[in-house]
Amino acid sequence: MLERLNNAFAAQRQFTGNAAHELRTPLALMQAQLELFSAEHPDVRPETAEFLTLLREQTERLIQMTRALLEMSNLQQVARNERIQLAPMIEEIFTDLAPLSDKLGVTLTAEGDGIMTGSDALIYRLIFNLTENAVKYNRPGGSVRVSVTQELEKLLLRVSDTGYGIPEEYRRSIFQPFFRVDKSRSREYGGAGLGLSLVWEITNLHGGCVRVEESSDKGTTIAVELPAGAETEPSGADIS
């Protein structure tokens, strides 16, 4: 039974990766043509300009989606044997997110450190996605705290925000592909709806688990538990 499920998931990943790969070129051409048309026709009517802006935004969203789907389909092939120190990585992520956090007036703070074995690129993506999500769905002037605690053979990462909270009935669903709690804010900030799904995939691939630790109208904390050593077998965690 387990072998059948693994084969089904592998086939699904292969199909998803192939579909995303085939979409990349036509989407890039669409984006280029839209940019060219906009540059050559700067004085179009307001309603046409608004329509062109909408087309560019939706094309960019589709490009982001295909990029994320390609990442997800290729995760199994990524080596996971690098030594990773998290504190410097988190500071780098804060620097990359500074334009967004400054724009929204959200303060970023970090505490703790830890060392683990895994894929540097994937763990960066995991923490980046969680932190970016916490910034996007925060209150104006809010804060995000990323903390790391190391305990013998495991490492606990927590990302806490001062946002509006996640309803209890959605706390497992948020890690499923394309699921969004607040669709209006998702439209405002773009994105493919795959950020937290990718977090779950990366965590699972490193033999860990991810969950909503607590959430209320005062904010949310998402906790990721990872083995500190070289364990890389998927945990098989259920998010249904």
Language-model regions, residue ranges each:
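Short alpha-helical segment of the dimerization/phosphotransfer core of two-component systems
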Residues: L54-L62
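Short helix-loop "hinge" at the ATP-lid/N-box region of the Bergerat-fold HATPase_c
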Residues: A134-V135
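Short beta-strand/loop element within the Bergerat-fold HATPase_c
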Residues: G141-E153
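Acidic ATP/Mg2+-coordinating residue in the GHKL
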Residues: D161
